[in-house]
Amino acid sequence: MSRRKPASGGLAASSSAPARQAVLSRFFQSTGSLKSTSSSTGAADQVDPGAAAAAAAAAAAAPPAPPAPAFPPQLPPHIATEIDRRKKRPLENDGPVKKKVKKVQQKEGGSDLGMSGNSEPKKCLRTRNVSKSLEKLKEFCCDSALPQSRVQTESLQERFAVLPKCTDFDDISLLHAKNAVSSEDSKRQINQKDTTLFDLSQFGSSNTSHENLQKTASKSANKRSKSIYTPLELQYIEMKQQHKDAVLCVECGYKYRFFGEDAEIAARELNIYCHLDHNFMTASIPTHRLFVHVRRLVAKGYKVGVVKQTETAALKAIGDNRSSLFSRKLTALYTKSTLIGEDVNPLIKLDDAVNVDEIMTDTSTSYLLCISENKENVRDKKKGNIFIGIVGVQPATGEVVFDSFQDSASRSELETRMSSLQPVELLLPSALSEQTEALIHRATSVSVQDDRIRVERMDNIYFEYSHAFQAVTEFYAKDTVDIKGSQIISGIVNLEKPVICSLAAIIKYLKEFNLEKMLSKPENFKQLSSKMEFMTINGTTLRNLEILQNQTDMKTKGSLLWVLDHTKTSFGRRKLKKWVTQPLLKLREINARLDAVSEVLHSESSVFGQIENHLRKLPDIERGLCSIYHKKCSTQEFFLIVKTLYHLKSEFQAIIPAVNSHIQSDLLRTVILEIPELLSPVEHYLKILNEQAAKVGDKTELFKDLSDFPLIKKRKDEIQGVIDEIRMHLQEIRKILKNPSAQYVTVSGQEFMIEIKNSAVSCIPTDWVKVGSTKAVSRFHSPFIVENYRHLNQLREQLVLDCSAEWLDFLEKFSEHYHSLCKAVHHLATVDCIFSLAKVAKQGDYCRPTVQEERKIVIKNGRHPVIDVLLGEQDQYVPNNTDLSEDSERVMIITGPNMGGKSSYIKQVALITIMAQIGSYVPAEEATIGIVDGIFTRMGAADNIYKGQSTFMEELTDTAEIIRKATSQSLVILDELGRGTSTHDGIAIAYATLEYFIRDVKSLTLFVTHYPPVCELEKNYSHQVGNYHMGFLVSEDESKLDPGAAEQVPDFVTFLYQITRGIAARSYGLNVAKLADVPGEILKKAAHKSKELEGLINTKRKRLKYFAKLWTMHNAQDLQKWTEEFNMEETQTSLLH
């Protein structure tokens, strides 16, 4: 390579070029990793003496320059630490890079000493990479290679700082290069308005004239008129412009590559290697690891696109674009809710080398929830009240739910639905009301990174009713061919406006993923909240009662679902979760479930054992069927699902006689007997498939009988014809070679080669093509084989394309039975849930509840279902009775010492009620449960920073919500209402609220309090209200008081955890302080002060009691007696004090 010529355009530029070259060479030598392979002599030693003298003269004439900073610069400690950390980053796919380095080193030969003339010595790989990177650095100012927000504002130096996160050369060299660029960057900002790229020869010049800079810039601009991007980079830029919000994985041969910011994201999140290649940072992963890495990126909240090659080498060779780049297109997009497809299928792709927990989160539900607001009522909007519509879809299972409701400023209704669905992704307009935005922020901020809800925003225009109505009608009108289709459209347009807006937005969103087909059957839509079918359990109650997850670490263990979940299948687990969050209201349906659980529990028939064994072996066929419905499944997955369904059909068909004779439950008989008939279509599709081809994914041999696939048959006949011609050509080859035993050989996939010993190569015709050789033999193709083998490969690749098209048609035909097969899976899930509840009932001391229409909750020796399991058999839970009914007491006021078990008791009552209405046995000796339409709770004391609410505000907001929604058929639980404010205000609010529920709402109520005045409501409503407390014992030894002592010893309380009639006069809070290891001195002082205050209060109460008697006296004798008693009481009080 010849030395760079001095730039023209003036003496200064001409004379300074060698000096700049010397500076640049010293820069390369200053970095520890940039040493020439030839010798230690730098470029400065090779500078022409005459040019050097001219440069020295020019430098003498110039004004003195400021002292140069130390070079290389000293790195700050935090940068040095970061560099060390990056050097130690484990590399997953550095094999291709190492091979490339080795290949280049071998090509260079290791010595450059033989060079002569003006040719520059060869530099090592690292030197050439840095030189090349500095050249590309100047071209990297292209807007498409950087985030749009940084294109106009960042300097060249700042842009360079983005690049070297992980490259072929070390970070110290890049930091030095960054410093070398800084001076030229400042000149560029002064002398150019646009993004001008400079020649490397300008780095080191400190006195280049403005005229020379302009000429250099003009020359550089002309140079850039040609494309600076590789064809692959241009292809990537075009695809990235269409999918700016997605991380793109681009198929390139045997690997998938990331470019630009996508590569940096992949390197950071996947812990893989990335480096600078041409104009972009790049990283790559092997094709067989795509499943793992896509799932990891999706779990982090990214939208991931997979770009695949749509051409093959053989077909491309005969096309018009044979010299151009392989065509590619986006074949799949994935987010948390749309993780469906052959590339990411966990059913097939998992192997022993993959850690399932590392790449998969809880897949029990994966809802995409779209929220829309009706903003027509301005007055309600100012108050925070608004009408909301939602549509939730679960693409993995095909489930679609919708709802519309009026919500208050607290957004409790929306929070309830979000808590029930637990969406993994939200689809929202670009702007929502302030209160809704606050709820969304709170919901997306409380979870950890991998479990965080992903938020996707769309422009508000897609949520406008006029646009949404048109989009929805167009979507459903294309399938309207009969009266039924017209009825479907009529049902859709009659939905509430916000629901239609949400539906239109979700249709548009799912079209991007090719998943909109699941919305084409609106008769399968289900309304989320139906007050006529299910008990109302809002989000606060789900959280307070720990129904789905505990409040300690937000995990399933320690929740009611954890106690009840003994399911064997994934789809059974999802159905049980619905049962738990939606207890039934219809007595007939509740008793049907209880009858089924009771029969499984007590039956001695072996049929239930057989069914349970069948369920234990099942994969997640619900998700598999949905993947088939969307035509995103592999042949392996399809065969596994269809074969599983076929075996289920056969097994359930075999037990039909036993079911008819041994099973009495109507629910079990119905679902079990319907399963074989619903699964009958799968046998036909299974017989068509070739098992071995399906298991290995070979679509060309997938179908046994090709009579239904004429295109595949035609293509295979053409292929066989070419093969026959090639085989017949062997006779001619034998004649040419005069070798009757000559045969074709296949080596490394290369077919139809003629193998000749190297000693006999002279007899080979000159027009034969040599394909390969070894030390002993050479292999050839004749011209006839070359032509026909090329044609054969083209036909084979065309066959693959034809088979793929026929495969999609085959899946389309199978999808006609999707809904009947899904119904069978739902029946299997129901059986699985019944078996799970039966296993719960076998745990011991569980009873079948008596469920009735009357308003009552009567429980004998009931236990908290979760605490009972957590304690185990060694530490048994203390059982308690409950008796609430419309005819007697329907309100329990519960007092007692702190930590006495009050909260556990009221939760126990609520959970037993929920279990009974699910259709489960309950932990009690006896239980009679009247159907309640909702359970409302106000428990705990904590502020809400996200809502900007104090503890007391949070209490009153929840209480106001209960007051609005509770009915006489509800169960209301209020735990220590009023403790977030002063004593007087707290007592007043607690008293007034409880009286309202007693007098007006008339619901079954459990009210926990530490305020004795609230207990006086029993006197006013003696038939409806009863006072209770949690039993305890006070130790006499430690509670004895020394009247003359200045310090008192706090009481020692033993908890009995037994509900007892009556009022607890004290709460014994100091006992809790003692258990918490509060220092003894503080406890004694607190005990003394407590007794003192208690005495003052008792004195006031006694005086009020005496003065109340005074107004009832009518003669002097009674007055005299009253005076004596009063004086005696006052004397005793003064002695005590």
Swiss-Prot record:
Phosphoserine carried by residues: 33
Gene Ontology biological process terms in this record: DNA repair; maintenance of DNA repeat elements; mismatch repair; mitotic recombination; negative regulation of DNA recombination; somatic recombination of immunoglobulin gene segments
Positions contributing to ATP binding: 896-903
Polar residues composition bias: residue spans: 201-220
Record keyword Nucleotide-binding present: yes
InterPro entries with a match to the protein in the record: DNA_mismatch_repair_MutS-lik_N, DNA_mismatch_repair_MutS_C, DNA_mismatch_repair_MutS_core, DNA_mismatch_repair_MutS_N, DNA_mismatch_repair_MutS_sf, DNA_mmatch_repair_MutS_con_dom, MutS, MutS_con_dom_sf
Protein keywords: ATP-binding, DNA damage, DNA repair, DNA-binding, Nucleotide-binding, Phosphoprotein
Annotated positions of the Phosphothreonine modification: 1099
Record-linked Pfam families: MutS_I, MutS_II, MutS_III, MutS_V
Secretion signal span: none
Gene3D superfamilies: 1.10.1420.10, DNA repair protein MutS, domain I, MutS, connector domain, P-loop containing nucleotide triphosphate hydrolases
Stretches the record annotates as Disordered: 31-122, 201-222
Keyword Phosphoprotein (UniProt): yes
Source domain of life: Eukaryota
Start-end of Pro residues biased regions: 63-76
GO MF annotations, alphabetized: ATP binding; ATP-dependent DNA damage sensor activity; double-stranded DNA binding; enzyme binding; mismatched DNA binding
Biased composition (Basic and acidic residues): 81-97
Region described as Interaction with EXO1: spans on this chain: 75-297
Alphabetized PROSITE patterns for the sequence: DNA_MISMATCH_REPAIR_2
Biased composition (Low complexity): 31-42, 51-62
Disease as annotated in the protein's UniProt record: Endometrial cancer: A malignancy of endometrium, the mucous lining of the uterus. Most endometrial cancers are adenocarcinomas, cancers that begin in cells that make and release mucus and other fluids. Familial adenomatous polyposis 4: A form of familial adenomatous polyposis, a condition characterized by the development of multiple colorectal adenomatous polyps, benign neoplasms derived from glandular epithelium. Some affected individuals may develop colorectal carcinoma. FAP4 inheritance is autosomal recessive.
Subunit structure: Component of the DNA mismatch repair (MMR) complex composed at least of MSH2, MSH3, MSH6, PMS1 and MLH1. Heterodimer consisting of MSH2-MSH3 (MutS beta). Forms a ternary complex with MutL alpha (MLH1-PMS1). Interacts with EXO1. Interacts with MCM9.
Similarity comment: family membership: Belongs to the DNA mismatch repair MutS family. MSH3 subfamily.
Function text: Component of the post-replicative DNA mismatch repair system (MMR). Heterodimerizes with MSH2 to form MutS beta which binds to DNA mismatches thereby initiating DNA repair. When bound, the MutS beta heterodimer bends the DNA helix and shields approximately 20 base pairs. MutS beta recognizes large insertion-deletion loops (IDL) up to 13 nucleotides long. After mismatch binding, forms a ternary complex with the MutL alpha heterodimer, which is thought to be responsible for directing the downstream MMR events, including strand discrimination, excision, and resynthesis.
Name of the protein in its database record: DNA mismatch repair protein Msh3
